[in-house]
């Protein structure tokens, strides 16, 4: 199973997991040479998948942070369907790209920050506070 993680906000980035293992993580500014570059990344995703020897047809799921969809331009113009219930829940969407419809989950922005902190800590239990400069736009 191949999973793409995509963030099109400031410091746009993406990662590729194959069979549960991280095989690539990329930031747009490393390609564009523009500090904190943002927006559309799919052209670069295509190139990096090709360099990793993965066809886009192998992608089973796309995950992204939902905060960018609230009143901002996330650069993910290929999102076909957006459903919002509560801002603290995962949002189920569909992405249409290269003629395929792929399941996509938008995970709350601060939950992404908290999960990274927790999983990088090697602790069984922890308390995590997240706070960033831009807010969540809702």
Question: Language-model features: where?
Answer:
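Short acidic/glycine-rich loops and adjacent helix/strand connectors
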Residues: 1-138
């Amino acid at each position: 199973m191949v999973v793409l993680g995509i963030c099109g906000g400031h410091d746009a980035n993406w990662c590729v997991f194959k069979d549960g293992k991280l095989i690539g993580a990329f930031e747009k500014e490393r390609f564009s040479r523009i500090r904190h570059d943002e927006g559309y990344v799919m052209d670069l995703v295509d190139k990096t998948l090709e360099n990793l020897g993965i066809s886009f047809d192998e992608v089973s799921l796309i995950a992204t942070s939902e905060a960018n969809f609230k009143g901002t331009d996330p650069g993910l113009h290929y999102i076909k369907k957006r459903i919002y219930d509560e801002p603290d829940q995962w949002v189920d969407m569909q992405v249409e790209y290269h003629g395929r419809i792929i399941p996509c989950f938008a995970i709350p922005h601060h939950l992404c920050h908290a999960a990274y902190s927790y999983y990088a800590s090697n602790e069984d239990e922890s308390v995590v506070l997240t706070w960033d400069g831009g807010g969540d736009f809702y």
